[in-house]
Amino acid sequence: SRGLGDVYKRQGRDYRIAGGAKYTILEDNIGYIYYGDFSSGIGNGNLDEILLYLSACNGLIIDVRNNGGGNLTNATLMAQRFTNEKILTGYIQHKTGKGHNDFSDPTPIYVEPSNSIRWQKKVIVLTNRHSYSATNDFVNSMRCFPNVTLVGDKTGGGSGLPFSSELPNGWGVRFSASPHLDAQKQHIEFGIDPDKKVDMSKEDENNDLDTIIEEARKMLKVTL
């Protein structure tokens, strides 16, 4: 699961870059965006540029495999381009005491639609077990939108606000200080299942093909 930067680079495929995202148009007129790190900034100008370039495409693949997270603001900015209305995407809880279960009542989280260019067609989001933290939150938001399907493997989880510390022996510890629940108030800390599970095939890999991208392309062709 290496995304645009590897398989397609070896095929000599051209792609554009806007902020932290790489994007291109595949042969069957399907748009493809690879966002490998939400720590890499993306602004509204970047998102306008990408969606304008891909606007004639019949469908869109957003690849966040191996995206270990980063800045939740970037993840939210991107998600806002895929809804036309304010959508409840989950809840967050905050620690209120030292007890194991001392948490506040769940506070709702909404994604508001962007007031700029918004994508109106089908979207497939590609995920794997290395999609963590802010990426997990992004995937959780995206699956609340009616035109979005998740394909690949379960995400790595780790939503919520991370807390980092160092133990006396020098080991680092990192955990979610504020549990994040989905819209049905279920925990998503341990990952989000795809709508369709697809594994990489060794044969495809040897032929410089990405099984999961190929499956997403097939699915988008069927739904067009």
What are these regions (language model features)?
Residues 194-224:
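Low-complexity, Gly/Ser/Thr/Pro-rich intrinsically disordered linker/tail segments
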Residues 33, 62, 82, 123, ...:
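Terminal peptide-recognition signature
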Residues 40-58:
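A short, well-ordered alpha-helical element
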Residues 33-34, 54-69, 125-126:
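Short acidic catalytic loops
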Residues 20-42:
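STAS-typified acidic loop motif
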Residues 143, 152-168, 173-175, 194:
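C-terminal soluble interaction/assembly domains
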Residues 70-122, 160-164, 177, 181-188:
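Gly/Ser/Thr-rich loop/hinge elements
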Residues 1-8:
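Short, small-residue-biased leader/transition segments that mark boundaries at the very start
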